Structures are given as structure tokens and as C-alpha cells.
Amino acid sequence: MAVHKEVNFVAYLLIVLGLLVLVSAMEHVDAKACTLECGNLGFGICPRSEGSPENRICTNCCAGYKGCNYYSANGAFICEGESDPKKPKACPRNCDPHIAYSKCPRSEGKSLIYPTGCTTCCTGYKGCYYFGKNGKFVCEGESDEPKANMYPAM
């Protein structure tokens, strides 16, 4: 009888461990299946946090990206950007001396992606805007960005 209980316990333990391995593997699988052909994109814009109180950026509220907030060197809120990357406003190129840095919903990675390589709308990152070689807006990316250092070195 004791052997039967030990076998049941080991079998139960193996099932639980197997389910844990399966669930952890599923977390790393991108649910979006994209085709393998390359897109014909010219460049991409990904609004990102930029600058710091010590390393100021040169922009103004008109030219700043919608969804990004702009701050002074002492951290006071100045404005939210007014320019939509899909339809940029005609804005002056002057630097607002009050703006030191920006905070955007996404802060990792490059702001300008050029060239885009083999990126398509499907493989492009959410929150990034992709344009054709003629400069016209094509699409917003559809895939989640990979988390930085997802598999750290051991």
C-alpha cells in the first residue's frame, strides 16, 4: 500500500511539473504569427523618452509627439506633444528653452528606425509608426516589443 501511495505522489508531482514547464514556455510564445516576407517600408518612428535635466533635448510643444509629456530641467510639466507621427504638424524648428526632456509611454529602443530591414506591419512594434519609401504613413506596428534581457546570461 505504501508503494502505491509513493507511485501516485511521484506521478502527481511529474504532472504538476510538466504543467509548470508548459505554462512557462507558453508565456514566451508570441501569439501573433507573422508571415516571413519582407515589407517595403522606408522608415519607422517610435516615440521614446529622451533627454534628461543634464542632457537637454531640442524640441517644442508643437513638434513633440502626442502621448509624450515634456518637462523642464527641474521636473515641472511643460506640455504634451501636439504632433501625431502619422500626420505631422507643420511646426517651427525652434528649441523651447523651457523643455529639457520627454517622458513617453515606451522608453526603450531607438526613436527612428532606418533602414527598417525586413520589418512588416505585423512584425513592427506596437506604438511605432511605419512609413513607405515615399514618406507616407503605412501602418502602426502590431507586435509586442521583446522584453530587454529576457534570457539573462548565467
Curated annotation (Swiss-Prot):
Spans of repeat Sequence: 31-87, 88-147
Disulfide cysteine pairs (residue numbers): 34-122, 38-118, 46-128, 58-95, 61-79, 62-91, 68-104, 121-139
Domain of life: Eukaryota
Stored SUPFAM superfamilies: Plant proteinase inhibitors
Keywords recorded for this protein, A-Z: Disulfide bond, Protease inhibitor, Repeat, Serine protease inhibitor, Signal
Site positions (Reactive bond for chymotrypsin): 36-37
Keyword Repeat (UniProt): yes
Signal peptide from the UniProt entry: 1-25
GO MF entry, a single one: serine-type endopeptidase inhibitor activity
InterPro entries reported for this sequence: Prot_inh_I20 (IPR003465), Protease_inhibitor_I20 (IPR051391)
Site (Reactive bond for trypsin): 93-94
Signal among keywords: yes
Family assignment from sequence similarity: Belongs to the protease inhibitor I20 (potato type II proteinase inhibitor) family.
Designated name of the protein: Proteinase inhibitor type-2 P303.51
Protein's organism: Solanum tuberosum
